[in-house]
Design a protein with these regions (language model features):
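Active-site-proximal cap/loop segments of hydrolase catalytic domains
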Residues: 1-114
């Protein structure tokens, strides 16, 4: 999934140049930045249980965005979980973490889709 609050990604992820080229800076093009941060800024409309599985060192979709979304959903009493995999990036390389991800997916599906 993409970053839910792109404002938190500015300067924290690897895409700063692309952001500036495509949508400008947050201070020069605030309206657009708020629009693309829609999921976080409209968290009060989310009712779907949510599972965040994130690498601690993910520079593609930084941890901060998942932490913010998780906290917002917890505050709103939406069922949500945040699992952070230490030392991992966007793609996990530790076999036990990959196994854990699959087990968590299956448990989540069993709980919320059955």
């Amino acid at each position: 999934a993409g970053i839910a609050n792109i404002l938190s990604g500015f300067g924290d992820d690897q895409y700063i140049r692309e952001y500036i080229v495509e949508i400008g800076t947050p201070w020069d093009n605030t309206e657009t930045w708020l629009k693309v941060s829609h999921p976080f800024l409209n968290a009060n409309n989310i009712v779907t249980p949510t599972l965040f599985l994130v690498g601690e060192k993910d520079y593609n979709v930084p941890l901060i965005g998942s932490e913010q979304m998780y906290q917002a959903l917890k505050y709103l009493n939406i069922p949500t979980e945040l699992i952070v995999y230490p030392g991992e990036h966007h793609s996990f390389s530790t076999p036990s973490y990959n196994k854990d991800v699959l087990e968590r997916y299956l448990a989540w599906y069993e709980k919320y889709l059955n």
